[in-house]
Amino acid sequence: MASYLTLFISAVVVNNYVLTRFLGLCIFFGVSKNLNASVGMGMAVTSVITMSSILAWVVYHFVLIPFNLTFLKTVVFVLLIASFVQLLETIIKKQAPALYNMWGIYLLLIATNCIVLAVPILNADSNFNFLQSVVNAIGSGLGFAMAIILMASLREKLRLADVPKPLEGLGVAFILAGMLALAFLGFSGMISI
């Protein structure tokens, strides 16, 4: 049980995909202008990462390994992720049209988000068992959600600040992201998997 907790904390904080590995920055910068959209996107990315990792683990261990097709891992994982995101898009469009309109193109970008693909690939490369893969996926998704919510909170506070004209928009967003990354750098080396 302790190893699963360690893996979870490592995925959320120590090896945060956005702030330590710099993956998924397109959605991170694009959606973090609005806190509500960021919370929803964090939940969506977490669910997509988790479900994609579960599907990828099953396909990898019951199809690709037995038939010696592991070289197709990336292509198969991309197809699984794209299919799941398409399903999620259809559900959100029907059930929550306001959220669907708020996210815009970023919902489809989840399918091509490098975090969503990196987690199942790293799970496979790390030879994680099923439960380890699920724990790592949930932790990675929640780490992304935490990072984007922190960023959105800071960006909303900055709307009230007097930001120099050349730094408005993405300029100050990159500075904020760098400061967050430096803060999370302090956790590096605390947990090794």
Swiss-Prot record:
Main location: membrane
Pfam families noted in UniProt: Rnf-Nqr (PF02508)
Keyword Transcription regulation found: no
The keyword Transport belongs to this UniProt entry's keyword annotation: yes
Keyword field: Cell membrane, Electron transport, Membrane, NAD, Translocase, Transmembrane, Transmembrane helix, Transport
Membrane topology listed for this record: Multi-pass membrane protein
EC number: 7.1.1.-
GO cellular component: plasma membrane
A GO biological-process term: electron transport chain
Listed transmembrane segments: 11-31, 39-59, 62-82, 102-122, 134-154, 171-191
Domain of life, source organism: Bacteria
Top EC class, one word: translocase
Subcellular location: Cell membrane
InterPro entries reported for this sequence: Ion_transpt_RnfA/RsxA, NqrDE/RnfAE, NqrDE/RnfAE_oxidrdctase
The family this protein is said to belong to: Belongs to the NqrDE/RnfAE family.
PANTHER family linked to this entry: INTEGRAL MEMBRANE PROTEIN OF SOXR-REDUCING COMPLEX, ION-TRANSLOCATING OXIDOREDUCTASE COMPLEX SUBUNIT A
Matches recorded under HAMAP family: RsxA_RnfA
Subunit structure, interactors included: The complex is composed of six subunits: RnfA, RnfB, RnfC, RnfD, RnfE and RnfG.
The protein's role, per its UniProt record: Part of a membrane-bound complex that couples electron transfer with translocation of ions across the membrane. Couples electron transfer from reduced ferredoxin to NAD(+) with translocation of H(+) out of the cell. Essential for energy conservation during autotrophic growth. Contributes to ATP synthesis during heterotrophic growth.
Protein name: Proton-translocating ferredoxin:NAD(+) oxidoreductase complex subunit A
